[in-house]
């Protein structure tokens, strides 16, 4: 950077007007001019002629000379100076501030020989706002309108290349943007119609009233429950008599219960002779499941039929009989009777209370 050479009438060397002004603003050594009009004086100063000459002399490929000439010449003697309006503060900065704004906003990315000063963002934005203050709106629409407008607008920061305008969108730093940005709702992207969510299909739980659980797995109900036991006992004699008289079923086993039979274990020891003669043969020690219909209740009982070795002999046991004994209220001294249908091989079991004869003293 040099001083102005003599040209077009000569003149002394002066530093660049706009560069000196920018440096003074950056260093805060010169106060800002008064924005109000200055009082007019009686004598009108001569109108200066501002000649800005930018000469780029490329003498060769390696050497480049940049001469910037700026001088204030005296009024030409051939014409009479015309009166100029009173300075209006920032209006006289038209030549300087245009360069100032272009340097501050860095609107052009093309290489140039101009010297770029490192200006503070606050000065750059202040000058930009004073020059373009008419571009900012004085009122803002409702928040929901701003949201729709901003959501559908293309963001300048997404576009490639330099900023195309000096609006608020060209400032990416929050400190350089005006306070109006705080009143705008956040931009969450374009508004799209929400997809209808498919209703969740929950697994259907099906409960059957016919399936009833008992405390033991050895009981199967047909359609009635044990609560019908008192009513069913009314036809006990008639049904038993009918079955016996029909000849389809015959008694194959009769056992008087002992204290060990009605214990908590629920295990009934069967007579060896009757068990081997009428019940299915046991070839292994593994239990055999026997299904027996109740004589009184519409229930099918599942018993485990097994044997225990006993001194080169066998002891036959009807296991899992605790629920059957409890349902009929059988105690020691009562009797169980097992019936068998010879043709299909079905079994029927019956519990009978013992009859105690009471003797009275004379």
UniProtKB/Swiss-Prot annotation:
Main subcellular localisation: nucleus
Entry superkingdom: Eukaryota
Record PTM text: Polyubiquitinated. Ubiquitination leads to its subsequent degradation via the proteasome pathway.
Entry keywords, A to Z: DNA-binding, Nucleus, Transcription, Transcription regulation, Ubl conjugation
Gene Ontology CC annotations of this record: nucleus
UniProt function note: Transcription regulator involved in iron deficiency response and tolerance. May regulate directly iron transporters or other transcription factors involved in iron-deficiency response. Binds specifically to the DNA sequence 5'-CATGC-3' of the IDE1 element found in the promoter of the barley iron deficiency-inducible gene IDS2.
Protein name as it appears in the record: B3 domain-containing protein IDEF1
Organism: Oryza sativa subsp. japonica
């Amino acid at each position: 950077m040099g001083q102005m050479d003599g040209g077009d009438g000569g003149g002394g060397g002066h530093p660049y007007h706009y560069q000196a002004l920018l440096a003074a603003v950056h260093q805060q050594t010169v106060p800002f001019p008064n924005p109000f009009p200055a009082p007019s004086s009686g004598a009108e100063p001569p109108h200066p002629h501002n000649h800005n000459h930018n000469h780029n002399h490329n003498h060769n490929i390696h050497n480049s000379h940049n001469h910037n000439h700026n001088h204030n010449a005296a009024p030409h003697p051939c014409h009479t100076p015309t009166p100029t309006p009173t300075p209006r503060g920032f209006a006289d900065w038209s030549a300087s501030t245009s360069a100032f704004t272009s340097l501050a906003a860095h609107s052009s990315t093309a290489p140039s020989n101009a010297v770029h000063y490192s200006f503070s963002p606050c000065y750059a934005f202040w000058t930009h706002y004073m020059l373009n203050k008419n571009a900012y709106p004085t009122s803002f629409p409702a928040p929901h309108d701003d949201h729709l407008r901003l959501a559908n607008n293309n963001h300048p920061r997404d576009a490639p290349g330099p900023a195309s305008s000096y609006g608020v969108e060209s400032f990416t730093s929050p400190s350089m943007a005006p306070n109006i940005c705080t009143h705008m709702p956040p931009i969450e992207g374009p508004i799209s119609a929400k997809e209808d969510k498919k209703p969740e299909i929950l697994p259907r739980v099906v409960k059957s009233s016919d399936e009833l659980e008992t405390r033991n797995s050895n009981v199967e109900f047909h359609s009635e429950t044990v609560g019908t036991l008192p009513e069913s006992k009314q036809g006990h004699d008639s049904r038993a008599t009918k079955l016996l008289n029909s000849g389809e079923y015959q008694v194959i086993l009769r056992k008087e219960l002992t204290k060990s039979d009605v214990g908590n274990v629920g295990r009934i020891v069967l007579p060896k002779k009757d068990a081997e003669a009428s019940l299915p043969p046991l070839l292994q020690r593994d239990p055999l499941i026997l299904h027996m219909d109740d004589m009184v209740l519409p229930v099918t009982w599942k018993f485990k039929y097994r044997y225990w070795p006993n001194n080169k002999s066998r002891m036959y046991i009807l296991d899992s009989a605790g629920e059957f004994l409890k349902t009929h209220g059988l105690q020691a001294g009562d009797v169980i009777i097992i019936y068998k249908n010879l043709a299909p091989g079905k079994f029927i079991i019956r519990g009978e209370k013992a009859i105690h004869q009471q003797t009275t003293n004379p």
